[in-house]
C-alpha cells in the first residue's frame, strides 16, 4: 500500500529512535475506514497498484498489514492542527528498522502524503541544525518536536501519494 515509502528508505527523513510517543498519536484515519489503496501521482494522474492496506488501530497508532504477506508497519499520526499530521512510520519494527517521517493531510476523503525527501530538504537550506545530511541520506538531529515538521510542511512539494478508502 505505502511500501513505496520504504523503497525510498535512505532517501527520506528518518531517525533511529522515535521522535513522538504513543500518547501524542491520534487515530486520524478513523472517519475514513480501515482499508485503503495507495496511489501515486504519475503524469498528472493518480495511479494505484491495487494493493489494499489494512489499518488496524492499536492504542493511539495503526498497524498496517496486507492480505499478501505478514509484514507490518507501525504508523503514528501526530496532529499539527487543521487535519495536518506528522506521520511517524516504522517498517516491521521487529527488525529495528529506522523511523521514517512524512506529512499527512487528511481531508476530502483521502490522506494525502508528502514525502520528506532528503535531496529536496537539502535544497531548502538552513536545516543543518535540525537535520544531518550524508550523501542522499538524512536524519533528524536530537528531538526538534513538531516545530521542525510544521516548518517543513509549508516548504515541501505537494503530496505525490495518497491513501484512498476502499469499501
Please annotate each region the language model reported.
Residues 7-10:
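C-terminal motif of bacterial Sec signal peptides marking the signal peptidase cleavage site
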Residues 12-32, 39-50, 56-167:
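Calycin-type beta-barrel ligand-binding domains and close structural analogs
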Residues 1-5:
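Sec-dependent signal peptide recognition
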